[in-house]
Amino acid sequence: MMMGESISELKYWMWFTMAFGPANPRKWNALPYYGTAKQAYEKISGGDLSHVSEQDLKGVKAATMEKAEKMIEYCNSHNINMYSYDDPDYPERLRQIYNPPSLLFASGSLKGLNDAVVIAAGGTRRPSRYTVEVTERICRDLAQAGVVIASGIAVGLDSVCLRSAMHARGKVISVLPCGLNCNYPKENADAKKVIARMGAVLSEYFPEDRPSSAYFRARNRVLSGIALGAFITQAGIGSGALSTASFAAAQGKDIFCIPPHELFNDEYAGVIGLLRDGATPVFDARDILNQYYGVYAHKLNPDADIFKIKGDRDLFSRTEQDNSESGKQPAPPPKQKAPAKKHEQPQTEESSDRDSSSDRDSSGRVFISNVIDSDDIKVPSEHPIVYALSDDKKKILDFISQNGTVLFDEIVEAASDIDDVE
């Protein structure tokens, strides 16, 4: 499926990407000499290899327009959207980074991404309970406030970030280190379907490309590139999340970290290093929202609970004053909730009774097939929970709000780690 441009233009970008390779920075050295992707095809096909490096000769000679057109047909038949560098819906922030993808493949849509508050969030695959709890709360609050959460699809903090945002009915983006139709491992197919319905799954690699060690680091530059900032929740010295932070710093993006609760634990050494280098410590979602509210107030939700915490300066009051000075129309004030009585806990979805369901097994898990009708019910061989995917997004979200984290927890935890590649 083509998005925003004709096949006559897209086919030249497809050929160009095939000729030089998806994440190859050398193609951007060659393109200015040739002009456009179309002109590059015409000149190179005519024998002008003067700006093709020796490393790229084999790929350039192997690429043909026939192969490019067949790849476009394949993507159209598999409902894969394609966005070339010249596409009006191509993420503008990606255009500004070093070595942007010449072509993006997507399940889902990228429309509206250019003026959205996108935060790349993630961390270690083996987080502490403290980090999981804090990450869940912050990502949920960010999503409720209108922030788009972008991450990988690995088990651990990547899945925690995505799951928490989806529970808050927020938009999410997952960037893969392989092709969209490469299910590595195979269980991730279901997780990708859910994420695509709640936002988009992206890759710069051709649909059936398998992951390699080089693809993971290249993926992280795209992850940080589509975002305004990187939120690293927990990382040791060798954590792959640090490469996302490194790319974010090189791209001029903000870096945020959760303060560790064990200063001398090596599992937090990477985050401590980022904080020492000037990363912003995040105590709640407002530490991230404060950074962007002045410019992106129109994209945020004024009724989000995070803006109503008693005793703190209200973001909307501050912005109303700023807007009056600049002549801008102020955002509407948030609706206030009645404060909880002393010693009384505020009522939340989490504190509501969820144990009365008769659709649970002995361990308390919900058999979603008993609650949601669907033609796409999967039973993982090593994970006994029955879960369902539904085309009715509202039905899924309403079920989650009533039953907690069951649906996406089980889908993501049933999947092995896509980033675990030897």
Where do the PLM segments sit?
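Short, small/acidic-rich helices and loops at N termini and domain boundaries
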Residues: 1-88
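Glycine-biased, small-residue-rich flexible motifs in mid-sequence functional cores and linkers
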Residues: 2-7, 84-422
